[in-house]
Amino acid sequence: MKKLFLFFTLIFTAFAANSGLFDKKQTFLKVDDAFAFSATLSTDKSQLQAHWDIADGYYLYQDKISAELVGKSNPLSLHTQQAAELHQDPYFGEVKVFTHSIDGIFRGTFNNADDKVEITYQGCTEGFCYPPETKVLRIGDLAVSQEQIVEKTVEKNTALLSEQDRLADGLFHSKWTIFGFFLLGLGLAFTPCVLPMLPLLSAIVIGQQQRPNMMRAFSLAFLYVQGMALTYTLLGLAVAAIGLPFQIALQHPYVMIGLSILFVALALSMFGLFTIQLPNSLQNKLNTWSQKQTSGAFGGAFAMGMIAGLVASPCTSAPLSGALLYVAQSGDLFTGAATLYLLALGMGVPLMLITLFGNKILPKSGEWMNTVKQTFGFVMLALPVFLLSRILPEVWEPRLWAGLATVFFIWFALQMSKNGFGYAIKIISFALAMVTVQPLQNWIWQTQTTTQSAVENMPVSQVKFKQIKNTEELDRTLAENPHSIAMLDLYADWCVACKEFEKLTFSDPQVQQQFQNILLLQVNMTKNSPENKALMERFNVMGLPTILFFDQQNNEIQGSRVTGFMDADAFSNWLKALH
């Protein structure tokens, strides 16, 4: 009996063992247990603090974490306190992941309690990968955090942010930052994008037949700057809402040619060939408000300022990019509009001062005034050259400038002779005319040597960029990158600051030394092709120039983006910091 009992005991034990062996199943945590998520708001409601507790053996992908306000297409940028780790993933290869925990900040404006934020993330563990998980959070349901870790996180990451990101971050933290944009505008007033507006303002105020007194001159200059600021503000908001296609549309050859014809007509009117004024019927109705709607009238000054705003609009600078980035991410049009207006007002103040002092210094009566008016006619002719240089082949720009300068010096010498000035001035004027006409002589007679021709046609920066046409080619090229960093330059022929980068920054020896360890890529955005639009939407590009930097995992390096011109020293230091 004992033997039978022992036999059946062994049989049942074996079956139980077999059952346990074949039925054993590896269990994985539920997604909310593997990646416990929580979120709070900062006290000023400008930051959403996200926290993940990650179970041991699990990890979240850095590039799979994203967030956006529901109903708005612009993503919210994430800044984390922890550094991501490199991980060899069986599904995605070498990637950056977070383990243990994440403290992250999404910047935005979260004042509306009914707004919702969508936060998406994805993680894995050995042998199992979770699908993307999305949390929809109502702003009014989030608790307000008093913890200081938020401020420390911001402080740590601010040093890594580009200038435009720091400016946008400043707007998120305090609305008083908008007044700092006025000071930034003062600095922008002396950039190549803003200086072309000076001759137009000077022609309106100083170039009249009857010189205005200081009060009237100030009023004309003030209205001109207000018109410029209004256009700049409205176009800035449109670019933030629509993106680069709007900026490109303003640079269409038809627009550039149309503006050039307008400025040529205004210049010819200053030479006395004809008078620009409204039809008599309409002019009579407006006489009570303004004596004449010529270039010196208040309405004309405001209108010319609005046109001048179009001239400056395509130039992207770090302050402008910061304001546009804030509007795009927050949707706060009021603060964005005020920021853009103060930026434009700062750009206009130096123009007003130069014009007012010029109005006071120059003679106020006599035949000399006709000469002054015609001089500003030549200055105004510089605007079409500036505009057409964006759409014509580069070789035409020096020819146009040479032609304008030659005609001016010949005219100036004749004026000096007519008014009985000394021979020395006439000789100097004719000599300068002979010097400036040389590019035209070379072009007409084709007398340049082979060496000169080679120098003319040599790329200014002498930097070889690999041209990229679409997102697929970009991904393939980044995947084969032999260097630790790749740089993508978004360029357009009409972009003045892009040409400054090429001529002044990329050609610098210390910058070229840094380029030796970087994969250099470039996309020509001039035609705004479907491929250009796809790249623009993928990287949320708001203006040109824009330079992007990528790591070896083909991800854009956070806070590394450059928008607006940067000189050689600053750009070289920027590249060193990225390494």
From Swiss-Prot:
Topology of the protein relative to the lipid bilayer: Multi-pass membrane protein
Q: List the disulfide bonds.
A: 124-129, 193-315, 495-498
Q: Could you say which residues form the signal peptide?
A: 1-16
Gene Ontology CC annotation, any one: plasma membrane
Superkingdom of the source species = Bacteria
Reactions catalysed, as given in the entry: [protein]-dithiol + NAD(+) = [protein]-disulfide + NADH + H(+); [protein]-dithiol + NADP(+) = [protein]-disulfide + NADPH + H(+)
Q: SUPFAM superfamilies, alphabetically?
A: Thiol:disulfide interchange protein DsbD, N-terminal domain (DsbD-alpha) (SSF74863), Thioredoxin-like (SSF52833)
Q: Which GO terms describe its molecular function?
A: electron transfer activity; protein-disulfide reductase [NAD(P)H] activity
Q: Does the keyword Lipoprotein apply?
A: no
Q: Which UniProt keyword terms apply here? A: Cell inner membrane, Cell membrane, Cytochrome c-type biogenesis, Disulfide bond, Electron transport, Membrane, NAD, Oxidoreductase, Redox-active center, Signal, Transmembrane, Transmembrane helix, Transport
Where are the membrane-spanning stretches?
178-198, 230-250, 254-274, 296-316, 337-357, 376-396, 397-417, 420-440
Q: What is its main location?
A: membrane
Cellular compartment(s)? Cell inner membrane
The role this protein plays is:
Required to facilitate the formation of correct disulfide bonds in some periplasmic proteins and for the assembly of the periplasmic c-type cytochromes. Acts by transferring electrons from cytoplasmic thioredoxin to the periplasm. This transfer involves a cascade of disulfide bond formation and reduction steps.
Q: Which PANTHER family match?
A: THIOL:DISULFIDE INTERCHANGE PROTEIN DSBD
Question: Could you say which protein family the record assigns here?
Answer: Belongs to the thioredoxin family. DsbD subfamily.
Protein name in the entry: Thiol:disulfide interchange protein DsbD
- Annotated source species: Haemophilus influenzae (strain 86-028NP)
Give the organism's phylogenetic lineage: Bacteria, Pseudomonadati, Pseudomonadota, Gammaproteobacteria, Pasteurellales
Q: Which gene encodes it?
A: dsbD
